[in-house]
């Protein structure tokens, strides 16, 4: 239940922020992404659980955000990475306010110098531990 809630919450936030949302393994990105900007959520990984009937479940979450146009100048690419970074911070900040989410911890954002798909895009990837309660 928490896993499904988490996926749906990220979907709602990313979609409201103007992203086309996708979720699956990374190997399927090129064939599934149809429009940009895109948000690609890898399936959340169950990390740990505390409690029996009530408690916490922690998931490792990886979210890629991508913008079309890999053929940007270096200055334009830097501006796009900066914007994507800000948008990832906003997505995870909003996620921390979701009903079943206790906290978003250890948020890390990295920029990729190569494309994640065969389409050609600028991408940034966020990883975080998301603590939910049940």
Language model segments and positions:
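Charged, amphipathic alpha-helical segments and their flanking helix caps
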Residues: 1-30, 44-134
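A short, hydrophobic beta-strand-centered structural micro-motif
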Residues: 34-45
């Amino acid at each position: 239940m928490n896993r499904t809630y988490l996926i749906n919450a990220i979907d709602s936030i990313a979609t409201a922020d103007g992203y086309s949302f996708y979720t699956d393994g990374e190997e399927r990105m090129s064939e599934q992404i149809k429009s940009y900007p895109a948000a690609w959520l890898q399936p959340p990984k169950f990390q740990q659980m505390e409690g029996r009937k009530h408690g916490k479940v922690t998931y490792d979450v990886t979210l890629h955000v991508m913008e079309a146009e890999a053929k940007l100048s270096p200055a334009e690419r830097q501006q796009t990475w900066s914007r994507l970074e800000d948008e990832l911070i906003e997505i995870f900040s909003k996620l921390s306010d979701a009903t079943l989410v206790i906290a978003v911890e250890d948020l890390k954002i990295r920029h990729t110098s190569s494309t994640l798909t065969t389409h050609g895009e600028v991408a940034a990837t966020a990883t975080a531990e998301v603590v939910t309660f049940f």
